[in-house]
């Protein structure tokens, strides 16, 4: 069993053992439905849960006892948690819902200034350790983070809580978000067997995949860029 499959199974077991309602989504769902595997070129393994059923703190507690899952910083306003595990990132996506759609928002990559603002906010404001902050599978990204941290460390400890709040609010306005949305009627699930685990997926998985990846979702594309090519992007609802 390769490391991707191993951490997939471990994540499923952690969620199941703690009675978390979840489903497989995004590129993970795509790989399983199209190829019956986790896509080797995909950089993360995606799980969806409902934000009105479980909090980030609750999920963090469940993963904190496993030293192989290393948490990364995620802005509070983003609807997910990230853990590095092996060569991939485990993404726990907290979907919001109303009577029409299910939706999620993330920071929009590609805007370097926006990403820098986000990194500044959550290093200054977070209690997460230095080691976790610089965690990255990309050596260059890790070096860049270390250089930024050397600049930010004095700010973190010198600034008052009140000033940090003001800085947080000001920088937060400069961050751009987008995300996926699905008709709420597609968010019903069935169980399949994958890697020896019983896992939930949307009953109409193919329709869900077409909504995100388009009618050619069955054709592999290794250079897919979600924030430019997804068909169901939204601004903040």
Features from the language model and the residues they span:
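Surface-exposed, flexible loop/turn segments at secondary-structure boundaries
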Residues: 30, 55, 98-100
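Active-site nucleotide-donor binding segment shared across nucleotidyl transfer reactions
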Residues: 12-45
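Tryptophan-centered motif/residue detector
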Residues: 23, 41, 216-217, 226
């Amino acid at each position: 069993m390769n490391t991707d499959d191993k951490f997939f199974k471990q994540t499923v077991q952690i969620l199941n053992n703690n009675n978390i309602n979840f489903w497989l989504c995004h590129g993970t769902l795509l790989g399983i439905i199209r190829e019956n595997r986790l896509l080797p070129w995909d950089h993360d393994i995606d799980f969806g849960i409902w934000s009105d059923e479980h909090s980030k703190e609750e999920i963090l507690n469940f993963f904190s006892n496993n030293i192989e899952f290393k948490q990364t910083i995620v802005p509070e306003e983003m609807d997910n948690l990230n853990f590095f595990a092996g060569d991939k990132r485990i993404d726990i996506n907290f979907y919001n819902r109303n009577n029409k759609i299910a939706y999620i928002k993330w920071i929009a990559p590609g805007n370097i200034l926006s990403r820098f603002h986000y990194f500044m906010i959550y290093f200054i404001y977070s209690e997460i350790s230095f080691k976790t902050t610089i965690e990255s599978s990309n050596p260059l990204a890790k070096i860049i983070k270390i250089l930024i941290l050397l600049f930010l460390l004095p700010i973190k400890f010198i600034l008052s809580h009140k000033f940090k709040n003001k800085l947080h609010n000001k920088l937060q306005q400069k961050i751009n978000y987008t995300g996926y949305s699905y008709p709420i009627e597609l968010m019903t699930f069935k169980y399949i067997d994958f890697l020896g685990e019983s896992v939930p997926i949307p009953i109409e998985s193919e329709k869900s995949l077409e909504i995100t990846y388009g009618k050619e979702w069955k054709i592999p594309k290794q250079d897919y860029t979600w924030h430019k090519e997804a068909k169901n992007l939204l601004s903040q609802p």
